[in-house]
Amino acid sequence: MPSAPAAPDAAASVAPNPPAALPVTVRWLGETPYDACFDAMRAFTDARTPDTDDEIWVVEHPPVYTLGQAGNPAHLLVADSGVPLVKVDRGGQITYHGPGQIVAYLLVDLRRRKLMVRTLVTRIEEAVIETLAAYNLASARKAGAPGIYVESGPHRGAKIAALGLKIRNGCSYHGLSVNVKMDLRPFLAINPCGYAGLETIDMASLGATADWHEVAQTLVRRLIAHLDGATAAAALPQQALEQSND
């Protein structure tokens, strides 16, 4: 688990195209408890300077529910589910993280990149939509409901990705999650993101056969491309994506 401002040996710091683009450090953290990531991203944000590179942390969490700072605890429907609940300082309501889900934390200096919060959210959403499209899954935004939803078919309207950020001193932390191949039953114990009866789905249930690591690589490429306003080629060299801290 990284601690601010020291960098783990496994970090890959690369500058995406074009050459003038700002560098991004990608950290592959494997399976890490949620509390450890939460504490580390806040410490990183508090310690960063105007010269600190932006970072993306890619992680898989053991089962945990997280409740946003304005979230209503009543959206946890089963008090004795056996899954811990952590109250956090991001926006949004309650969600679930667990094995088989990609979680990507975006530690971004919005002022340096001249990004408004809404612009950053839109670019994150577009990166997720493009990632899912790479596996022949059509998805879309939904007005008034942050996240990404299945666009067509029998699971139309089901949520497949969640998003929630915190901005402190012009810098973001927290991020997004994409359901790849996971046990979806814990979502039945909550109103996902505060919406009663909202179906939650994963890529495997929609027929996608790609594994977690492959999808994570695709997602990171798209996120970095969109951080710099790109909409085309992958932004990270494959060798950098393949580094891990195993």
Curated annotation (Swiss-Prot):
Q: What is its EC number?
A: 2.3.1.181
Instruction: Write down the chemical reaction(s) this protein catalyses.
Output: octanoyl-[ACP] + L-lysyl-[protein] = N(6)-octanoyl-L-lysyl-[protein] + holo-[ACP] + H(+)
Q: Which UniProt keywords apply?
A: Acyltransferase, Cytoplasm, Transferase
Ranges for the BPL/LPL catalytic domain?
A: 50-231
A GO cellular component term found in this entry reads: cytoplasm
Which CDD domains does the annotation name? LipB (cd16444)
The reply to whether Acyltransferase figures as a keyword in the UniProt entry is: yes
Binding-site positions, substrate: 90-97, 162-164, 175-177
At the top of the EC hierarchy, this enzyme's class is transferase
> Is the Membrane keyword given for this protein?
no
One Pfam family assigned to this protein is LplA-B_cat
Location relative to the cell: Cytoplasm
Instruction: Give me any GO biological process, just one.
Output: protein modification process
Pathway per its UniProt entry is: Protein modification; protein lipoylation via endogenous pathway; protein N(6)-(lipoyl)lysine from octanoyl-[acyl-carrier-protein]: step 1/2
**What is a GO molecular function of this protein?**
lipoyl(octanoyl) transferase activity
Which chain regions cross the lipid bilayer?
Answer: none
Swiss-Prot/TrEMBL site (Lowers pKa of active site Cys) positions: 159
Under Gene3D superfamilies, the record lists:
Bira Bifunctional Protein, Domain 2
- Active site annotation, chain numbering: 193
This molecule's function is given as: Catalyzes the transfer of endogenously produced octanoic acid from octanoyl-acyl-carrier-protein onto the lipoyl domains of lipoate-dependent enzymes. Lipoyl-ACP can also act as a substrate although octanoyl-ACP is likely to be the physiological substrate.
> Which HAMAP family does this chain map to?
LipB (MF_00013)
Q: Which family does it belong to?
A: Belongs to the LipB family.
Q: What else is known?
A: In the reaction, the free carboxyl group of octanoic acid is attached via an amide linkage to the epsilon-amino group of a specific lysine residue of lipoyl domains of lipoate-dependent enzymes.
> What's the protein name?
Octanoyltransferase
Q: What is the lineage of its organism?
A: Bacteria, Pseudomonadati, Pseudomonadota, Betaproteobacteria, Burkholderiales
